[in-house]
C-alpha cells in the first residue's frame, strides 16, 4: 500500500512506522529501535515501466494497484535514481527515432547503482534479429549502459547482464554484481545502513556463522569478515552464481555456499536425510555461534524458527514486521531482543524493513 509522494510529510510518515514497530515489539521488552531514514527522493535504484500507446507514441506508464486499465503516464519518476530520470527522456527519444527499437516494444526496466552503473532491459512482443542488435549496440554506447533485449525465449545482451554496486561497510568497500532479474535491495543508501548495522550487531566473533537466504551475498560479504567461517544457503541459481562471483571478486574465502532451502538445511542439520548438494561439506566441523536470517515476507516457517533456537545469537532482517513479531514470539522463551532497528527502505509506503538481534537468555 502506498501513500502520496510528499517529501514534506516524510518525517511524519517515518514516525508512524516507528510507532508501529515499537508496538509490535513491545510484548518482548525490546529496546527503543534505532531508526535509519532514507533520502526523500531519488532513492530507488530500479524501476519497471510498461509502455502505453497514445497518439501514435509510446509513454512510460505505471498502474495503481488493482487497476491495470488506467495508466499513469510519466515523464520522470521522483523516487527513482537521478540516473534513471536522466536516461528516461533520452531513451524515449531514441526509440521514437528508430523503427527497429520501437517495433512491438512493451516494457522497459532500469537497474542502476550508487556507483554509477546502469542497465536497461527492453522487452518485446517479437523476435529480435541482427538489425535490432546493431541498433541496440549503438544505443548502449550512446547512453553508456549495458542493454538487454528480451522476447519470448530470447535474451540478447549488449555489455553485461549485471550492474556493479560498491558499498562501504566499516571502512571497507565491497563490490557487488547485481544480475538482471535477480532480487536486489532497491534503496541503495538504506541498504548500506543495513549492512553497517548488521556488521556492528554481529560483533567480532571467534566462532562460525550460519546464514539462511543469502541472496547475492549482500550481507554475507561484510559478515564473513567478523567470524571464522560461514555456511550460507540460497535456492535461486541466479543468486547463487552472483554470490559466488561476489565472494571471489572481494577475496572472501571463508564462506561455503550451498544451494539448499532453509527447510532442507534444517533436515540436514537434524540428520533427517543426506543431500548430494552437501557433498564435501562437513557440517560437524562448524562451531556455529550465530545465525543470520533474511527471510521472505512470510517469515521463517516453524521448523526453521526452531532451528535458529539452538544458536546463541540470532541476527534477523525482516521485510514484514508482523511475521517478525510472530517469529520472536516463538523464540521469546529462550531469546531476548537485545537490539532492534527500523530501516526505511520504502518511503511513502506502509512497508518497512527492520532488524533485531536476539540473544539467548
UniProtKB/Swiss-Prot annotation:
GO molecular function, one term: tRNA (uracil(54)-C5)-methyltransferase activity, S-adenosyl methionine-dependent
Entry binding sites for S-adenosyl-L-methionine: 185, 213, 218, 234, 294
Biological processes annotated in GO: tRNA methylation
InterPro entries listed in its UniProt record: MeTrfase_TrmA_AS, MeTrfase_TrmA_CS, SAM-dependent_MTases_sf, TrmA_MeTrfase, U5_MeTrfase_fam
Active site residues per record: 319, 353
EC number: 2.1.1.-, 2.1.1.35
Recorded catalytic activity of this chain's protein: uridine(54) in tRNA + S-adenosyl-L-methionine = 5-methyluridine(54) in tRNA + S-adenosyl-L-homocysteine + H(+); uridine(341) in tmRNA + S-adenosyl-L-methionine = 5-methyluridine(341) in tmRNA + S-adenosyl-L-homocysteine + H(+)
GO cellular component terms given for this protein: cytosol
Top-rank taxon: Bacteria
Keywords for the protein's UniProt record, in alphabetical order: Methyltransferase, S-adenosyl-L-methionine, Transferase, tRNA processing
Matching Pfam families: tRNA_U5-meth_tr
Keyword Amino-acid biosynthesis attributed: no
Stretches that traverse the bilayer: none
Protein purpose: Dual-specificity methyltransferase that catalyzes the formation of 5-methyluridine at position 54 (m5U54) in all tRNAs, and that of position 341 (m5U341) in tmRNA (transfer-mRNA).
Family: Belongs to the class I-like SAM-binding methyltransferase superfamily. RNA M5U methyltransferase family. TrmA subfamily.
Protein name listed in UniProt: tRNA/tmRNA (uracil-C(5))-methyltransferase
Amino acid at each position: 500500500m502506498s501513500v502520496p509522494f510528499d517529501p514534506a510529510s516524510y518525517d511524519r510518515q517515518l514516525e508512524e512506522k516507528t510507532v508501529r514497530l515499537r508496538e509490535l515489539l513491545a510484548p518482548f521488552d525490546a529496546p527503543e529501535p534505532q531508526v535509519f531514514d532514507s533520502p526523500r527522493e531519488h532513492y530507488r535504484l530500479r524501476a519497471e515501466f510498461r509502455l502505453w500507446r497514445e497518439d501514435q507514441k509510446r509513454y512510460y506508464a505505471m498502474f495503481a494497484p488493482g487497476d491495470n486499465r488506467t495508466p499513469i503516464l510519466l515523464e520522470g519518476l521522483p523516487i527513482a535514481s537521478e540516473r534513471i530520470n536522466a536516461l528516461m527522456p533520452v531513451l524515449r527519444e531514441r526509440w521514437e527515432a528508430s523503427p527497429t527499437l520501437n517495433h512491438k516494444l512493451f516494457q522497459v526496466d532500469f537497474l542502476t547503482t550508487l556507483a554509477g552503473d546502469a542497465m536497461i532491459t527492453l522487452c518485446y512482443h517479437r523476435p529480435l534479429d541482427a538489425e535490432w542488435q546493431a541498433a541496440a549496440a549503438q544505443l548502449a554506447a550512446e547512453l553508456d549502459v549495458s542493454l538487454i533485449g528480451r522476447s519470448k525465449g530470447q535474451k540478447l545482451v549488449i555489455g553485461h547482464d549485471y550492474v556493479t554496486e560498491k558499498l562501504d561497510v566499516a571502512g571497507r568497500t565491497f563490490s557487488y554484481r547485481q544480475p538482471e532479474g535477480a532480487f536486489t535491495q532497491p534503496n541503495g543508501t538504506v541498504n548500506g545502513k543495513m549492512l553497517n548495522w548488521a556488521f556492528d550487531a554481529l560483533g567480532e566473533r571467534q566462532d562460525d556463522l550460519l546464514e539462511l537466504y543469502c541472496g547475492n551475498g549482500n550481507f554475507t560479504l561484510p559478515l564473513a569478515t567478523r567470524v571464522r567461517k560461514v555456511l550460507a544457503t540460497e535456492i535461486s541459481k541466479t543468486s547463487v552464481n552472483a554470490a559466488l562471483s561476489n565472494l571471489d571478486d572481494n577475496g572472501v574465502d571463508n564462506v561455503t555456499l550451498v544451494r539448499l532451502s532453509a527447510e532442507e538445511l534444517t533436515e540436514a542439520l537434524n540428520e533427517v536425510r543426506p543431500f548430494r548438494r552437501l557433498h564435501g561439506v562437513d557440517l560437524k566441523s562448524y562451531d556455529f555461534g550465530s545465525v543470520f536470517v533474511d527471510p521472505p515476507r512470510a517469515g521463517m516457517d516453524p521448523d526453521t524458527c526452531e532451528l535458529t533456537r539452538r544458536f546463541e545469537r540470532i541476527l534477523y532482517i525482516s521485510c514484514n514486521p508482523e511475521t517478525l513479531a510472530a517469529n520472536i514470539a516463538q523464540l521469546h522463551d529462550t531469546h531476548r531482543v537485545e537490539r532492534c532497528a527500523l530501516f526505511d527502505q520504502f518511503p511513502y509506503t506502509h512497508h518497512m524493513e527492520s532488524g533485531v538481534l536476539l540473544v539467548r537468555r
